[in-house]
Amino acid sequence: MNSDRTTLRRAHARDAVDAADVWLRSFSAALPTVRRAHDDDEVRDWFATVVVPRQETWVAVAAGSVVGVLVLDGEELAQLYLDPPWRGRGLGDRFVRLAQRRRPSGLSLWTFQINGPARRFYERHGFAAVERTDGLGNEEREPDVRYVWPSPPL
């Protein structure tokens, strides 16, 4: 599975369920100890009624299947999830470069503190951790960390 064989394109309404399913599989694989705040059907409904129609949503498509999803909400990189077999193949890098091109003035994002691979990934792409919380402000009640790009001056 080479990321060069994937197409990145804006999501259409018909992609909502497939994008949500990528989110569900990726979340479960990457964060097995984190309690999800919503069941599968609620996540699919959220993608269909909020994420795809109201936010700048991109999908990665390989052989006709959605294998990744990127969501930009204003200056926030709100979602970046890959089907587990597609991790480590450069697709996430392509999504981050796309987000940086789309928001050259800067991006911010939140990820869970427990998600070391995601944190290292964003740090490799020039994001800097600027805030940590105890998680009481997110639905999962999981300690999180806010990243910004470009990194603020020291």
Q: What feature does the model see in each segment?
A:
Residues M1-T7, S151-L154:
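Short, low-complexity, intrinsically disordered N-terminal peptides in bacterial proteins
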Residues A48-V59, E76:
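A short helix-loop-beta-strand connector motif used in the catalytic cores of GNAT acetyltransferases and
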Residues V59, S65-Y81:
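Conserved beta-strand in the GNAT
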Residues S105-R119, R124-H125, V130-L154:
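C-terminal "cap" of GNAT-fold acetyltransferases
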Residues A20-T49:
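Conserved GNAT-fold acetyl-CoA-binding loop/helix
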Residues T7-D21:
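A short beta-loop-alpha structural element at the N-terminal edge
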Residues L82, G88-R101, R120, R124:
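Conserved acetyl-CoA-binding loop-helix of GNAT-fold acetyltransferases
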